[in-house]
Amino acid sequence: YTGLYVVYDEFSKYLEANIKEASVSDTKTLQDFAEKCNRSGSMQLHLMLISHKEISNYIDTLPKQKVDGWRGVSERFKHIHLNNNFSQTYEIIASVIQKEPTKWARFQKNHQKDLEELLGRYKNHPLFSANSTELETAIMGCYPLHPVSTFILPRLSERVAQNERTLFTFLSAEGTSTLRSFIDVYDDDSFNLITPDEIYDYFEPLFKKETFGGEIHDIYLLTSAILSSLAVHSLEAKIVKTLSLIYVLEQFERLKPTKDEIVGVYSSSFSVKDINAAIDNLIEKEYVIYL
């Protein structure tokens, strides 16, 4: 026996649900625990808090006294950032979505213009690295996923997935709003993409289960309220679901909630005129502020 290692998984969910109610005594207890860890000698004591974001990202709206307390907590920890290799994840997705070589070659020839437009739009987009292999895998290998869906899927799964609904169950399981359900009605001669709204539909049950008062749950409640006023399969509803996922991910430096991004997602299925009209309709009804 050489010591104790305490791991608090999903600490971010605790912060989202309780940070406003947490007392000064609560933060003091955590500070004392961290300080004890830092002073432990041969009988080591470690405390690991696993969170999606830095503590500083959760305290913006707190009173100054609480902000100071949480900053004191944060300063007592060594911050380690883990960056997943999503390029490998795209390769895994591509390996799951197997294509019959002869038919796929014919499809690429018939839809060369559509595929080139996708490659052209996302070639210099911050969604993917400048590595041409990653872009090729994300667009060609992961087809029929839209490139934005390919970007969102593993990151969303990382944030909210549970055993019954993950990146891999979306790709392999039967049921509604899965890859298989899309392929079952897919026309091999058409250029159709799985857009982010379908990923929203698949993970929606998990949004409901998110911690009440947490950021993701609040986004879900707002999204549901707006969707209740829209036709189920309307372009407006699809756009709202996509915007919701963009805000859940919070990676605005790479995926922004802008009109151009929405046009990029839906221009293979709808005219730019129709997309702009749908966005204008949402703005007019004050379902979105302005894109």
Regions found by a protein language model. Name each.
Residues K20-F33, T61-K66:
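Substrate-gripping "pore-loop 1 plus following alpha2 helix"
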Residues T2-D26:
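Conserved P-loop NTPase "ATPase switch" module shared by AAA+ and STAND
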Residues T2-V6, Q44-L49, F77-H81, G141-C142, ...:
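Beta-sheet entry/capping signal
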Residues Y1-T2, E21-S25, E35-L45, V232-H233, ...:
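Secondary-structure transition/capping motifs at alpha-helix termini
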Residues S224-L291:
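Terminal-proximal interaction/regulatory segments of ATP-powered molecular machines
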Residues D9, D189-P205, N276-L291:
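Accessory beta->alpha helical hairpin/"wing" motif in late/C-terminal subdomains of nucleic-acid enzymes
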Residues E35-I183, E198, Y202:
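Conserved P-loop NTPase catalytic core
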Residues K99-E100, T166-L230:
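Long, low-complexity, charged/polar intrinsically disordered regions in eukaryotic proteins
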